[in-house]
Amino acid sequence: MYKEMNKKEENIVLIIQIILISAIFGFIYETIFYRIDLGYFVKRGYTIGPWLPIYATGGLLIYLSNIKNKNNILKIFINSSVMCGLLELIVGYLLLHISHIRLWDYNTEILNYGNIGGYICLRSVLFFGLSGVFLMSIVVPYITKLQNKKIEYLTYILGVLFCIDFIINYIIK
């Protein structure tokens, strides 16, 4: 029999789900975008699984920074654009200057207006804003209605796989 989760457990499961959905959504978005941009499929990221950790971080930032704004689409859009734009700029810069890794470079891509050092561009920032509105207005309300024991177990299993994949491919390598 399914035991109801308490509020803390619900929040943990929801946050893990947001992280996973955002990471997978980012992988799908980039796979489609680079197929269009380059004309062939490219496996994005260094993980084995179909997820990109920077999008997981972005999704979590969007959720945490917009909890109180969840009914204000304009605030969600602006907040998500700024938060994720800064995340992408800072992470891109640090990866290049500390680890000597460049995971993205908007200098060579289509629709790269407003490009800042290849780290961010207007297209990506606008996409993050729209993604934030989609996450807060559609995804979060939908997944909060779906909670049950099977989904909770699946969330934990996928969360552990995501963490293992991240640790092996970003930290240990």
Feature names for model-found ranges:
Residues M1-K173:
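Aromatic-rich, lipid-facing transmembrane alpha helices and their immediate juxtamembrane interface loops
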